[in-house]
Amino acid sequence: MSLAKVKHIVLVLSGKGGVGKSSVTTQLALSLSLAGHSVGVLDVDLTGPSIPRMFGIEDAKVTQAPGGWLPITVHEADPSAGVGSLRVMSLGFLLPKRGDAVVWRGPKKTAMVRQFLSDVFWDETDYLLIDTPPGTSDEHISLAENLLQKARPGQLAGAVVVTTPQAVATADVRKELNFCTKTNIRVLGVVENMCGFVCPNCSECTNIFMSGGGEVMANDFGVRFLGRVPIDPQFLVLIETGKRPTYPAGTTVDGKDISTPAGASTSEEEEVKDGSRLVHKYKDCSLAPIFSKITADVISAVQQ
């Protein structure tokens, strides 16, 4: 396998579509990089590969090396800033056109997943995050079989399971937790995503759906609850346009003031969607301290 230089493999799973799994994968990757770790992201959501867009690199082209592919570099390591490298591989880079549909039957999907695991040349990587499609489909079964058979002992660290608070979501995500049990994949924890909405004017967080469903589910299964993540429009603006997040005076997260300084100006460079600068802009996002804690808990769970 081409995973020889990868220390820890973490799956990001959800039994329900639309819960923000790729958003969670993206922010876990950025947070791990900000913690100084070298990170890889493998996108095996074959029919809906959204990871290239999340990192602002959807126009990148994969380099074919003898015997396989070289992943796309989002940014190189910056030891002086304590930032680790970040690389990405996705089927989205291999499609002739961005809007092309992937109409494959199960055997072809299985073969593609197997090829992604064996033919992508990852350099020294502390954490490889594998973003999966929703449900328990052919991709999941192929991933589980190949990783459990071929990964080194302890290399497959486990899975982070993503849900939203509503019962209609947790009912399906419970099936994903059962899938992990049946395939002997350790659950590192549950993230409750979209648990509230951060107002762009006053930054007050309102529970527009409900709250607590993910924590109840985690407790029912006896797994770690990693935390709640609200919807922040500034994160969406960052991903879609590349603009650095800004917040009104008095905005705090976990007691820390993240207000944008009065009179702060934004250069033209800061307004450009550039994947290589994403990690530095993300530090100003209200979700960054939340994911910093979630990431620390994931690392702790991996090392246990």
Curated annotation (Swiss-Prot):
Superkingdom in the source lineage: Eukaryota
Binding site for ATP: G15, K16, G17, G18, V19, G20, K21, S22
Compartments it resides in: Cytoplasm
SUPFAM superfamilies listed in its UniProt record: P-loop containing nucleoside triphosphate hydrolases
GO molecular function annotation: 4 iron, 4 sulfur cluster binding; ATP binding; ATP hydrolysis activity; ATP-dependent FeS chaperone activity; iron-sulfur cluster binding; metal ion binding
Keywords: 4Fe-4S, ATP-binding, Cytoplasm, Iron, Iron-sulfur, Metal-binding, Nucleotide-binding
Essential cofactor(s): [4Fe-4S] cluster
InterPro entries: Mrp/NBP35_ATP-bd, NUBP2/Cfd1_eukaryotes, P-loop_NTPase, YlxH/NBP35
GO aspect biological process, one term: iron-sulfur cluster assembly
Cofactor binding: number and manner: Binds 4 [4Fe-4S] clusters per heterotetramer. Contains two stable clusters in the N-termini of NBP35 and two labile, bridging clusters between subunits of the NBP35-CFD1 heterotetramer.
Region (Disordered): 249-271
One of the record's GO cellular component terms: cytosolic [4Fe-4S] assembly scaffold complex
Residues reported in the UniProt entry to bind [4Fe-4S] cluster: C199, C202
Major place of residence: cytoplasm
PANTHER family the UniProt entry points to: CYTOSOLIC FE-S CLUSTER ASSEMBLY FACTOR NUBP2, NUCLEOTIDE-BINDING PROTEIN NBP35 YEAST -RELATED
Family of this protein: Belongs to the Mrp/NBP35 ATP-binding proteins family. NUBP2/CFD1 subfamily.
Self-association state and partner proteins as the record states: Heterotetramer of 2 NBP35 and 2 CFD1 chains.
Function according to Swiss-Prot or TrEMBL: Component of the cytosolic iron-sulfur (Fe/S) protein assembly (CIA) machinery. Required for maturation of extramitochondrial Fe-S proteins. The NBP35-CFD1 heterotetramer forms a Fe-S scaffold complex, mediating the de novo assembly of an Fe-S cluster and its transfer to target apoproteins.
Name by which UniProt lists this protein: Cytosolic Fe-S cluster assembly factor cfd1
Species per Swiss-Prot/TrEMBL record: Neurospora crassa (strain ATCC 24698 / 74-OR23-1A / CBS 708.71 / DSM 1257 / FGSC 987)
Gene: cfd1
